[in-house]
Amino acid sequence: MKPRNINNSLPLQPLVPDQENKNKKNEEKSVNPVKITMGSGLNYIEQESLGGKYLTHDLSIKIADISEEIIQQAILSAMSIYKFSITDDLMSMAVNELIKLTKIENNVDLNKFTTICTDVLSPRVTRHNKEKNKRHSTLLKNPLFNFH
């Protein structure tokens, strides 16, 4: 017995006949995973999942694929999103987050990556600390704020 639509009592029909459904599933299952390299340095893999094709990130990024520009952009994005001021803590967090995104296989790669991150962030951290010290010393020179 077919289900009936209560509103107008017409039988409900499947949207796609069963045979067409079976043919589509067989076609989808025959698709082999294909590796596609994108310009961003990230690799994408087209893979089967429940009979359908989905693009997923391949997070095995190599150190060579991570340029200083990408690191700098990641840090600036984090700063603007989370309203971080540039501090040693931010530098440490940024390095750790970027390391998590990569599957670093040995300490040599980890050291290279940490050096790149530090090189990118150090000038900003130094500038931030100088500005902070300058503001602090200006307050100390002001007799209204000198509590010693």
Swiss-Prot record:
Residues 1-11 have a biased composition (Polar residues). The lineage of its organism: Bacteria, Pseudomonadati, Pseudomonadota, Gammaproteobacteria, Enterobacterales. This is Putative uncharacterized protein YgeF. Residues 1-31 are annotated as: Disordered. Residues 19-30 have a biased composition (Basic and acidic residues). It comes from Escherichia coli (strain K12).
